[in-house]
Structures are given as structure tokens and as C-alpha cells.
Amino acid sequence: MKRKNIALIPAAGIGARFGADKPKQYVEIGSKTVLEHTLGIFERHEGVDLTVVVVSPEDTFADKVQTAFPQVRVWKNGGQTRAETVRNGVAKLLETGLAAETDNILVHDAARCCLPSEALTRLIEQAGNAAEGGILAIPVADTLKRADGGNISATVERTSLWQAQTPQLFRAGLLHRALAAENLDGITDEASAVEKLGIHPLLVQGDARNLKLTQPQDAYIVRLLLDAV
């Protein structure tokens, strides 16, 4: 039986570091919001069977997304943190029967709207049948410094360091189990939750273009990348 690939986009955050008057996933770049650009990537990819967006219960922008993408499921059951939002989304996918425990969930940051299609394909091909799952990531290229106040305390050896990206792909049952803990403090991505179970996900080569819109100046680079598509 074919294993489904389901994209899950947690979009309940407020994007405080971005400094806009609305959550950063709803900031417009060109004629579309960041979230609409992101959803388009998954809706155009033939390897993705279903896309779900999980937003805050108080979200007032999601109706536009639903209008633009009527086939996308938009659920207003987001939590206070990313981990809670993903947990709620996975639980509902399983409860509604839209996902079986053996189906793949690809969790992707709403603010990574420049994900190249070939990177998504690579993740599905290399991690889609791996029981331990896998994530897109790129080797750390810059020299890293450990800080002590405002001074350098040490240079960090970067040989084995990778920078995590998204999507992060895991079986629905595994992800549900990994996020079942009552206290999700310190869980900054899905891989870190899975690692706490003693499982070591695959590292799949990501792409430098798959950057996350975090600071206001990132919008300039994102705009250039989107214009180049």
C-alpha cells in the first residue's frame, strides 16, 4: 500500500522578531502572502498528497488562505508553541483518518517560502521509506564562536555540524509519540523530539535558498529568490 506524504504547516506563531504589524506568514511579498508562496510549493509538487495548515484559534487572516487554496485543510487548533501546534495537527490527522500511523508527515516552516522543488523531492526519495525519518539540512559553512557575555570564549569545531532546515519528515505514529510529552520545553523542531526517543533521523542535503524569513532584512533576499523562480 502506498504511503501518503502529508505536508503540515504550523502557522500559529506571531513572528515577533520580524517586527511587522501582522504575523510574518501573512506579510505580502509581491502579490501573495508568505504563507501562500509556501503552500504553492507543496500544492504543485506531485509527491505531496495533502497539505494542512494549523493556525491559531484567534487567527483572522486564514480565510484568505482558504479561498486561495480551497483544497488545503486549514485548522484553527494551533498551540502556544510550534511543538504544541504540530502535536495538535498530527493528532487531528490521525483522529480524522486523514493520516495512518505509517504515513509520512512533512512538517515545514510557514516562513520558508523559497523551498526548491528538487530539495523537497530529495527528502521524499531519501527519507520517505526510512523508519527513522529525516530532515533537510546543510553543513555549517561559517566559523562559529561561543560567547561569554560580549566576548568570544571559544571557537566551535564545525566539522560535524549541520544547520537544520525544513521540511522534517517522520511517520505520523512516530511523530505523535515523540510529541506526546506533557512538557515540550526545549523542543525547537520535530527532529529534537524524535531524538529524545533515542532515534537518529537522516540528514538529507538541503539548499541554501531554503532560508527562513526571520528578520526584516530577510524579506529582500526572499523577494529576489521568488522573482528568480
Curated annotation (Swiss-Prot):
One Gene Ontology molecular-function label: 2-C-methyl-D-erythritol 4-phosphate cytidylyltransferase activity
EC number: 2.7.7.60
GO biological process, one term: isopentenyl diphosphate biosynthetic process, methylerythritol 4-phosphate pathway
Record has Transferase as a keyword: yes
Residue numbers marked as site, Transition state stabilizer: 17, 24
Site description Positions MEP for the nucleophilic attack, residues in chain: 158, 212
This protein's UniProt keywords: Isoprene biosynthesis, Nucleotidyltransferase, Transferase
Catalyzed reactions: 2-C-methyl-D-erythritol 4-phosphate + CTP + H(+) = 4-CDP-2-C-methyl-D-erythritol + diphosphate
Recorded metabolic or biological pathway in which this protein acts: Isoprenoid biosynthesis; isopentenyl diphosphate biosynthesis via DXP pathway; isopentenyl diphosphate from 1-deoxy-D-xylulose 5-phosphate: step 2/6
Enzyme class: transferase
Superkingdom of the source species: Bacteria
Keyword Transferase: yes
Family assignment from sequence similarity: Belongs to the IspD/TarI cytidylyltransferase family. IspD subfamily.
Function: Catalyzes the formation of 4-diphosphocytidyl-2-C-methyl-D-erythritol from CTP and 2-C-methyl-D-erythritol 4-phosphate (MEP).
HAMAP family: IspD
Official protein name in the record: 2-C-methyl-D-erythritol 4-phosphate cytidylyltransferase
Source organism (scientific name): Neisseria meningitidis serogroup C / serotype 2a (strain ATCC 700532 / DSM 15464 / FAM18)
Biological classification of the source: Bacteria, Pseudomonadati, Pseudomonadota, Betaproteobacteria, Neisseriales
Gene designation: ispD
